[in-house]
Amino acid sequence: MFIQDDIKENLPLFLVELYHRTQGDASVKVSMFDIGESLGLDRKLSLRTAEELIGTGLVEIKTLSGIIGITTEGVTEARQLGASLKNEKEFKI
């Protein structure tokens, strides 16, 4: 089914965008729909992608209205995918 393929394709992009929006801080809350919109996803695909990441423990649901946060495992995974924050790059030698 093409939706499942779309979800798999967008998982790393969604996680990295969440990492950037939260600055890797698990206490920061953002809308899954705003993240999806920035990636060109509709609300349904944003929801399904977020649910997939929630199921893996990389993202956690904060409110029933679509507010999510990244977990410490999600931060680790995003970094393994190549995500970094501007200030992290500045301090690397």
Q: Where are the regions a protein language model picked out?
A:
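Accessory beta->alpha helical hairpin/"wing" motif in late/C-terminal subdomains of nucleic-acid enzymes
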Residues: T63-Q80
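Short amphipathic alpha-helical interaction segments
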Residues: K8-E9, G40-G55
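Generic structural signal for well-ordered, non-membrane alpha-helices
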Residues: V16, R48-E51, T76
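Short, amphipathic alpha-helical interaction segments positioned at domain boundaries
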Residues: V75-I93
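Short acidic, hydrophobic short linear motifs in intrinsically disordered regions
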Residues: G24-E37
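Short alpha-helical segments that sit at the start of domains
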Residues: M1-L18, G24
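A short, conserved structural fragment
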Residues: I54-S65
